[in-house]
């Protein structure tokens, strides 16, 4: 594996040793990779079937048990120091606690990046996990990749969970941690996303496509027997970095999907079922889709067509057919634009540029599509040429955004990654 490097690990350990006064050899490091979703865009929150894999970039959290209940955190990317205790009861952001006070909101807390650490404690407390040890930790993300549509938030949440569990000698399964990270984002932060991100980060294996049913939580690691050609993952950044929780578009789309499900279930005599699209049979959708308002019809069409693309994509990956896999990715991108109606103009331009780049099998938005980056699968031998082409064309299309991107690197060439883990 090309990430993390020995140099990166050593730097993290030195920072924690300096903070804690402990020997560098005592420092443990959580490796929490970022994820991409080749197929399965925007359907995890509806119980759909999704695919994902991690990349060789992500979050590193060096830590030692604090020896008491204190949590002390610093970050390579963000200012300030986060300090609190694991025996403090954490409450969802904005909700009043028993004393009438409220948990600090992200806009008011000095070190807002610490909200995910508090959220991890909230999730573990909510799950009746007994936390007696805090951590002294140093957090470092891959430069320029936060808020880029690669689920850095889920990776951070997973990192804090694994560190706290390790420090407290808790045995927790990946499936349980998927639920705990969901509690951070849904319960603590109020974000209405699904479980794709944390599932990919916790379940992926190098070289495999993670295939997951978000209704049953069943998952499969699909190994490609022999790909036709080596591939790389291209990440092209738009320059839009607005945090997901401040954009009403995401939660609005979730509500629209639920409303579409409600109409279809009522029309088919199944109104007692939870209004999520996974509870609507495809035949029911075909029979009653004409009853949906135009906007709701588009959301439902994206869900059902994307589910089918995931199924076909699994078959293409398992047979080593990258060209077919790529075509499905591009079709997913088009449906995200036309049916799910997400993607600001810079992202749409990036998507179109990637489709014309040399060696690209397929491309689509990464993340929610309201900010961040686009991803592409590309022939390994043509990855450099593709990156150069995308950089040049995007600079012409969006010079203001392109000139302020990712430390001068608007396009990154990545490889597949592995699951989140603790290095002792």
UniProtKB/Swiss-Prot annotation:
pH dependence text: Optimum pH is 7.5-7.8.
Activity modulation comment: Inhibited by EDTA and ADP.
Active site: 197
Activity under varying temperature: Optimum temperature is 37 degrees Celsius.
Tissue-level expression: Expressed in roots, stems, leaves, flowers and young siliques. Higher expression in the elongating middle stem region than in the lower or upper stem region.
Keywords: Acetylation, ATP-binding, Calcium, Carbohydrate metabolism, Kinase, Magnesium, Manganese, Metal-binding, Nucleotide-binding, Transferase
Protein name in UniProt: Galacturonokinase
Family matches, as Pfam families: GalKase_gal_bdg, GHMP_kinases_C, GHMP_kinases_N
Residues annotated as binding ATP: 146-155
Cofactor stoichiometry and binding remark: Magnesium. Can also use other divalent cations like manganese or calcium.
UniProt xrefs under InterPro entries: Galactokinase, GalKase_N, GHMP_kinase_C_dom, GHMP_kinase_C_sf, GHMP_kinase_N_dom, Mevalonate/galactokinase, Ribosomal_Su5_D2-typ_SF, Ribsml_uS5_D2-typ_fold_subgr
Modification N-acetylserine, positions: 2
One GO term of the biological process aspect: carbohydrate phosphorylation
EC number from the UniProt entry: 2.7.1.44
Domain of life assignment: Eukaryota
Effect of residue 250 to F: Loss of sugar specificity
Catalytic activity entry: D-galacturonate + ATP = 1-phospho-alpha-D-galacturonate + ADP + H(+)
Site label Transition state stabilizer, positions: 35
GO CC, alphabetical: cytoplasm
GO MF assignments: ATP binding; galacturonokinase activity; metal ion binding
Enzyme class: transferase
Required co-factors: Mg(2+); Mn(2+); Ca(2+)
Function: Sugar-1-kinase with a strict substrate specificity for the alpha-anomeric configuration of D-galacturonic acid (D-GalA) and ATP. Involved in the biosynthesis of UDP-galacturonic acid (UDP-GalA) from the salvaged GalA that is released during growth-dependent cell wall restructuring.
Similarity field: Belongs to the GHMP kinase family.
